[in-house]
Amino acid sequence: MSINNPSAGKARPGTTLTVWTPEDKAFWAAEGQAIAKLNLWISVPALFLAFAIWQMWSVVAVNLPMMGFNYTTNQLFWLASAPALSGATLRIFYSFMVPLVGGRRWTAISTASLLVPAIGIGFAVQDPTTPYPTMLILALLCGLGGGNFSSSMSNISFFFPKERKGSAL
């Protein structure tokens, strides 16, 4: 099977994968490795962004009092923990999205959704009178990064043979 020969196989970039057998060494050498690496290179920036958004509140919450926000210590701890709680919950739902929507499409959609909490936080921290519930909602939305991170990791692992999953992930 050759990736340049249209009749050779069905696993080509830009199309829906109908055949995917990464454990088959001939398939892996002819088509699989190139497609797996392409998907990995696309996923790395998306994973970085997801992880950064997911962990953002652990830095933001610590600095809010110095920026003039009058939240209690308890409220600050909730802001720091909310992304982890919502991310763990969203992981359940996000795991089902790759088979339903497709890996590339879901990577694009879920990564684009990270703009909502990122831009929201950018505006919210500029005004010390931002209500706590608004900040909590933004913190919960940062959990989108946790769900994205976990679903993307499981999606990428699908592309590699068992012997190479460790080095890919």
Positions of the model-derived regions?
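Central cavity-lining transmembrane alpha-helices of secondary-active solute carriers
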Residues: 78-97
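C-terminal ends and interior cores of transmembrane alpha-helices
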Residues: 112-128
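Cytoplasmic loop-to-transmembrane helix junctions
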Residues: 75, 164-169
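Membrane-interface helix termini in secondary transporters
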Residues: 63, 95-96, 100
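Cytoplasmic membrane-interface "Motif A"-like loop-to-helix N-cap segments
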Residues: 99-111
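Extracytoplasmic
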Residues: 38-71
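Hydrophobic core of transmembrane alpha-helices in multi-pass small-molecule transporters
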Residues: 117, 131-147
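Intracellular juxtamembrane helix-capping segments at the cytosolic ends
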Residues: 147-161
